[in-house]
């Protein structure tokens, strides 16, 4: 039996994707639309308390293309807090005009593939803590996609010896390090939580960097032989002060 990699787990994660029902929304009186937007602004402002107290974070982006219009990403210490946030959001008046298109449930994850041996408690390491319980960047662009490690008769990631997997992940990670300062990456584990095994969320002020890193990694053995991917979502940041313009008709 192949040895399982150990993981460090941080905040729980919920990506929510919505399309706006513009046809119905435009039928609402302007005063009512403005009241809905104000209610949404209040909801988001209330969630900044978690960021300020370092008990979670969130990000909101306008998705490009027809897969969705909005992405709301929330991080919290407990899964039930994500349920509470989603339930609260669904009860907003404006939610009546938002059509759910996709969601992803996971948890911020670090694996031990690249970790050295140490007696130190990794959860007390400042660098590790910053990655498990992050403050999300306010980058111009976001990219999200789910992925699996392939497991079939020809290529099965889970049957490889752990030392082979460590070597492959080391080489894979070296490509990612070339994009340090250009891309901020967050890996969330979702085995047993959602339909794929991991979610990958990338932030950058240069949207072209997403294409560059994903393309370059296609030639890495870890991806070429063992990577399987879901849909890609690209978006531009949507700040609270942008809500009125975004929802204006």
UniProtKB/Swiss-Prot annotation:
Binding-site residues for Fe-coproporphyrin III, renumbered to this chain: 131, 145-149, 172, 185
Keywords from the named record: Heme, Heme biosynthesis, Iron, Metal-binding, Oxidoreductase
SUPFAM superfamilies: Dimeric alpha+beta barrel
Coiled coil start-end: none
Associated pathway: Porphyrin-containing compound metabolism; protoheme biosynthesis
Family: Belongs to the ChdC family. Type 1 subfamily.
Protein name (database record): Coproheme decarboxylase
């Amino acid at each position: 039996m192949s040895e399982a990699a150990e993981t460090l787990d941080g905040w729980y994660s919920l990506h929510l994707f919505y399309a706006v029902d513009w046809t119905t929304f435009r039928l609402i009186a302007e005063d009512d639309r403005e009241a809905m937007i104000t209610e949404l602004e209040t909801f988001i402002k209330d969630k900044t308390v978690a960021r300020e107290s370092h008990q979670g974070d969130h990000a909101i982006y306008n998705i490009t293309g027809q897969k969705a219009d909005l992405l709301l990403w929330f991080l919290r210490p407990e899964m039930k807090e994500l349920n509470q946030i989603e339930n609260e959001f669904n009860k907003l008046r404006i939610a009546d005009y938002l059509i759910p298109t996709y969601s992803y449930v996971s948890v911020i994850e670090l694996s031990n593939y690249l970790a050295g041996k140490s007696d130190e408690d990794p959860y007390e390491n400042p660098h590790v803590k910053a990655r498990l319980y992050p403050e999300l960047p306010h980058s111009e662009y976001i990219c999200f996609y789910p992925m699996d490690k392939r497991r079939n008769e020809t290529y099965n990631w889970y049957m490889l010896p752990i030392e082979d997997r460590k070597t492959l992940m080391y080489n894979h990670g070296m490509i990612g390090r070339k994009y340090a300062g250009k891309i901020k990456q967050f890996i969330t584990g979702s085995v047993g939580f959602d339909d794929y095994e991991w979610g990958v969320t990338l932030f950058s002020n240069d949207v072209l960097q997403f294409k560059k890193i994903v393309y370059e990694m296609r030639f890495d053995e870890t991806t070429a032989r063992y990577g399987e991917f879901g849909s890609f979502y690209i978006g531009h940041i949507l700040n609270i002060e942008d809500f009125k313009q975004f929802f204006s008709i």
